[in-house]
Amino acid sequence: MKTLKIFIGILLLLISCTSQAKKIGIIEMRCENQDNPLGVQSDSPIFAWKLEADARNINQSAYQILVADNPELLKKGIGNIWDSGKCTSDESLNIAYAGKPLNSAACYYWKVKVWDSRGIESSWTEIKNFRMGLLEQEDWTPAKWIAMETVPQKDLVYPGFQLAGNKVNPLDKEARMPQFRKAFQLDKKKVLSAVAFISGLGHFELSVNGTKTGDHFLDPGWSKYDKSSLYVTFDITEQLRNGENVLGVRLGNGFLHIPRDSTRYRKLISTFAFPKMICKVRVTFTDGTTKDIDSGNDWKVTPSPTTFSSIYGGEDYDATLEQVGWQLPGFDVTAWNNATEIPTVGYLSSQTSSPMKIKQQFKSISINETQPGIYIYDFGQNASAIIDLKIKGKNGAKVIMKPAEYLTDDGLANQNNSGHPYWFSYTLSGNGTEHWQPSFSYYGFRYVQVEGAVPAGVKNPKGLPVIEDLKLLHVSNASKPVGKFTCSNQMFNDIYSLIDWSIKSNMSHVLTDCPHREKLGWLEVAHLMSSSIAFGYDIKQMYTKTIEDMKNSQLENGLIPNTAPEYADFPHDFRDSPEWGSSGVILPWFLYKWYGDISVLRNSYKLMVSYVDYLTSRTKYHILYHGLGDWYDLGPNHPGYSQLTTRGLTPTAMYYYDLNVVAATSKLLGKESDYERYTNLAAKVKIAFNAKFFTKEKGYYDCGSQTANAISLYMNLVNDEDRESCLKQIIADIRTRENSITAGDIGFSYLLRVLEMEGASDVIYDMNSQSDKPGYGYQLKQGATSLTESWAALKTASHNHCMLGHLMEWFYGGIGGIRTDKESVAFKKFIIHPEVVGDFHSADVAFNSPYGEIRSKWEVKDQKFIYKVTVPVNTKAFIYLPTMKQENITEGGKPMNDVQDIRYLGTDKERSIYEVGSGEYNFIIAP
């Protein structure tokens, strides 16, 4: 009997160990690329998840999704809204909902389980939810757009004018910033949920019973307000109470209206309307009944303490105008007016892009009185930001705070090239310590010049207000970070930080060019920096919004303006440059390849085709001659228009690339006639391009610039027999210039990609490891903490631009070696090809791809190459190890011939190539 018990115990232990070794788990469940999203606008939302396993080479073989309108049903295994059944598929991304019709404003719950390639079934996941938005415009009824005051028709201006001067009439009366109030009663019924659907233009802050709702900044996102506006969805269940409740809404101008006050900075003048709002709150009770609170002329309105609001000029707040308790029940509103109902303009859609938020705070590293009564706070980092002020002083005292990227020779705030004059001002109420943050404007800065107050601890004979604390609050788009990079070379770590700060500072509601002077969505950066940004941040939602902005800004003739949303009708090439407008073609394709969502191509096809047809109409014998060219290349003159490359070359190369992208999209979508048309047209453009720009006896394009040759190679415009000579010309030009960069905004991205692609990362290293010539190292030496607009860090240009940050892509794709596979999407299959260059002896690079984390960590130690690779579950990688000798390689301590789950594919360019499935791999290459 004792022997039997021992036997059974051993058997149970073996069974337990076996089951533990065969597990598949589900992590990072997402609906519409978000965790528990609010305001889902699609009637067929997409689901996704990532997998984890405790064995290598594991894939998904099937999945099942359940969706219910009650979480209790899901607990019982019932999907009364959708039960997908067991679907044989290895797809874990972009699974489209296919159940019963979804209702506006309704909340749904979902869970999923999977089977892996061994037949092992996972447990059901935890329950997640998604809240639908208002799917149809009539779902807003009876809510109305309301305002405090309206703009006379004669004063509406959109798109606006840059440096408008006398093009725009002065306003009879400038917009005042309103605050709205709505009180409502909730009886004794128990509240199940309460959701607010709200748009306040230009920007709004919502409060419920005196508490701000959410942690967003500058809601809603920017849009082309004559075509569309965005609304935001908030769950306010926990903010409500029995009895009287109060909704409070404050509005600022944003891009809806640029004040015409000539004493403050204005990049442009435009007026779509004065601030306005619309709101619907739906309260659902446990008995199934609902109550809606809708905006209308029964809402109360009065001017707010925000006395000036400009996205370009700053923000003023007068605390003496505060009405204490206005957001709380019981407040007397007899002195307030009824809101004015106004007509609807454009359509409303949900803000599904990530909002802006306060992401990081900085304390001052020094405070100096550079002139009597003027104090400079240095926060040590140039960033897109607002200030956070704590101050104490007398009623009516006023403090002015001027942000700046750098200082004048006299030690004062220098805004000459970042948009001036810009300031924040605060007028004190005199009620103890006062705390204020701007709500409706931000700037790019490192320094703040303070006038009218003194720092705590400073002698104060005039009795000025005392600043108890002043911080810099970095504001940015809340897109999820997905990348990490560190290496043994400190200069390159600093360059990574330099570029990353410029990316974060320009990830706003659009990808801006700079966070101060313009704050506009100049489109060339969006496609040229796409991979550089996407390695660091999940930008699927942000870029999907950019595509919508381009659709709403596209002209009837197909032209996509250089900026989207288009707020100003810039002249000539500044409105119509193919290197910029091509984002309308390239971004949908990029999103499909990076994130695997083919619906982006379907939804963008008209945008793409209309634009290439427009470009075709502008050609002369298949060549384009308009545009800005290789903007800010490094030539003999002050940077601006292309200096070293004929301006017809880059737009024609871009046009050729666009044609090929549209052709590939046409084929993918089954549009065969379009595929043939654009393929044939591309072939004609290639012939014309080479006839126009290629000098065969010299082996280069145009005048032989880095940009001309690199973009021609990357776009496959170079004939096969000429590729080698063209590459040699690029490298020769770089070496002749002592490894100097000349390529600009358009060309540098393609220069790096071509050099990496052709195995010349040593050249990339040499170009970017020096500090005595204009480039990244030079900018660091000049004291830059974010990437500057010009290679030479000119003080006549912005010091926070991400348009030249393309080296970020090489950090991941070169040093880390993480590269997309041309035949795959969303990193389902990918390449790992690490580059050991210069004085690098280690690097650790990680990227949380759509399927999971890819990690490439290597070290050269004692002449050995020690390499750790992580491949996500449900994916495959092709690893290029830097040796031709298989016998010198071990994995997990075993010779490669003894490793059964790794497939040897051969060699290429002194590399051994292996195909691996998911899991962790530990390689050592002996000398």
Q: What positions do the PLM features span?
A:
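Alpha-helix capping and helix-loop boundary segments enriched in small/acidic/polar residues
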Residues: 168-175, 195, 213, 221-225, ...
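Active-site acid/base region of carbohydrate-active enzymes
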Residues: 203, 294-303, 447, 455-498, ...
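Non-catalytic C-terminal accessory modules of carbohydrate-active enzymes
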Residues: 269, 273-282, 292-330, 349-361, ...
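Extracellular/oxidizing-compartment recognition motifs
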Residues: 23-107, 111-517, 524-525, 541-542, ...
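Alpha-helical support elements that line or immediately flank enzyme active sites
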Residues: 194-198, 208, 386-405, 440, ...
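Bacterial Sec-dependent N-terminal signal peptides
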Residues: 1-25
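C-terminal capping/lid segments that line or modulate ligand- or cofactor-binding pockets
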Residues: 247, 317-318, 518, 536, ...
